[in-house]
Amino acid sequence: MTAAPARFPGRAPIDAYGNGGFRFAGMSHRGSILCLPSGIYAWSPADPLDRSSLSSALAEKDAMQLLILGTGAQHAEPSATVKRVFADAGIGLEVMNTGAACRTYNVLLGERRAVGAALVAVP
């Protein structure tokens, strides 16, 4: 699965999350998002998460050293296959609930790190 056209070109911190969406760069978005070096995109991940759900992130491997995966309200480990795909691509994968993922992404973005985030929306 590839991401939809960029909702916001470029990088921006996540200002708020909850109620099924996110706020960033003075905008709000309903649903899950991918925050990649090239922009912020609407994202409809498979359940359970699979490689095709993260293909857009993998396509930016040269610009990203780490992907923060926010799995929703609760922490949920991705499959060994998903972990292996990221390891093989040379991208670190950190998994946590979406709230922690937003905070971690913002800190690393503020440090100008080569980071991305795949964030599942929470109610």
Each language-model region and where it sits:
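Non-catalytic interface/targeting segments
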Residues: 1-52, 110-122
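Short active-site-adjacent helix-start/loop capping segments
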Residues: 42-44, 75-78, 103-104
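A short, acidic, amphipathic alpha-helical segment used as a generic capping/interface helix at domain edges
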Residues: 49-61
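Mid-chain, well-packed structural core segment of small domains
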Residues: 61-96
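C-terminal structural segments of small proteins and small subunits
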Residues: 92-120
